[in-house]
Amino acid sequence: AEFIVFRLMGYLAIACTYVIALSLVVGLIASLLGPGDQIIRLSDLPVWLGIGFATTLVLAAYGSIFNAMGLISPKYGVYLCIVFGIWEFMMGSFSIVNPNWTVASVSISHWALQMIDAMVLLAWPDTIQWAEMDNAFGIDSGLSVFWQPPVHTLGTASAGVALLNSVLVLLMVSVAWIFIAKSVFSRREIM
């Protein structure tokens, strides 16, 4: 298992450093360019850091899945990964349209989008009010298309609970696929 974990950690060290740095740069640019009472809107930075953190967890989950698929079938693993990628794209699209669909909750992209929706609600608590104003007055701002309140709150309607659920699910997916890869790898010889 150490070989698989070290391989994944090396990949994450490079990819996640880039993603977090990119999210900070984009967050800083967005906070400078967006309208606000101050020169820099610091309330934007938690959202962009949340996007970076969600992307980091998604990279860990996808990395462990693709690593395991490559170990399960060295010859056809790449084709399995392509099919899985198409599945994830479809489920991500379904999650944007309606996050309440049960079929979408079996995808990694759904949980990442739920995590980002929860971060938006934690950073900007009036987002629900703005979405309701859009619906009430028929304003087509696009908010209702790209943002939905998080649905996995265990009945509490709390964005913090939804964020915690999303983090735990993404971590459990990563750990489960690492153990699957470990069990496959333990039966093979290193050439």
Where does each model-flagged region fall?
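Secretory targeting signals
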Residues: I4-P74
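Structural signal for membrane-spanning alpha-helices in multi-pass inner-membrane proteins
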Residues: Y18, L22-A30, G92-S95, W177, ...
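C-terminal or late-domain output modules
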Residues: Q38-D44, A157, R187-I190
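Junction motif at the cytosolic side of a transmembrane helix
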Residues: A68, L168-M191
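Terminal transmembrane helical anchor/hairpin motif
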Residues: G77, C81-V175, F179
